[in-house]
Amino acid sequence: MEKQNLIDMEGVVTESLPNAMFRVCLDNGCQVLTHISGKIRRNYIRILPGDRVKVELSPYDLTKGRITYRLRTKSSNP
C-alpha cells in the first residue's frame, strides 16, 4: 500500500534529536526534519549522524520527512 504522491530523496544525517528525530541534509542542499519509519524502528536499525539515508517527503510539507532506508557505507573491512 505505497502512497504514490511521495517524493523519494537521499541525504546525510547531520544531527540526532530527541524522540527519534533527525536533521537530514538532502543532496540538493535542503535541511529536513525527519522521523524513523515503523520498519526501521521495529528492526532496531541504528541511525547515527553521518549515515546516508533515503527520505520520503510529502509534497504538502517539504520541511518534514520520514527515513525509510539506511544506505550501506563502504567500509574497509570485508
UniProtKB/Swiss-Prot annotation:
Family of this protein: Belongs to the IF-1 family.
GO molecular function (one): rRNA binding
Residues in S1-like domain copies: 1-72
InterPro entries: NA-bd_OB-fold (IPR012340), RNA-binding_domain_S1_IF1 (IPR006196), S1_domain (IPR003029), TIF_IF1 (IPR004368)
Name of the molecule in the record: Translation initiation factor IF-1, chloroplastic
Gene name per UniProt: infA
GO cellular component, one term: cytosol
Summary of the function given for this chain in its UniProt record: One of the essential components for the initiation of protein synthesis. Stabilizes the binding of IF-2 and IF-3 on the 30S subunit to which N-formylmethionyl-tRNA(fMet) subsequently binds. Helps modulate mRNA selection, yielding the 30S pre-initiation complex (PIC). Upon addition of the 50S ribosomal subunit IF-1, IF-2 and IF-3 are released leaving the mature 70S translation initiation complex.
Superkingdom of this protein's organism: Eukaryota
Native organism: Anthoceros angustus
UniProt-listed NCBIfam families: infA
Alphabetized Pfam families for the sequence: eIF-1a (PF01176)
Cellular localisation: Plastid, Chloroplast
Quaternary structure (record): Component of the 30S ribosomal translation pre-initiation complex which assembles on the 30S ribosome in the order IF-2 and IF-3, IF-1 and N-formylmethionyl-tRNA(fMet); mRNA recruitment can occur at any time during PIC assembly.
Keywords: Chloroplast, Initiation factor, Plastid, Protein biosynthesis, RNA-binding, rRNA-binding
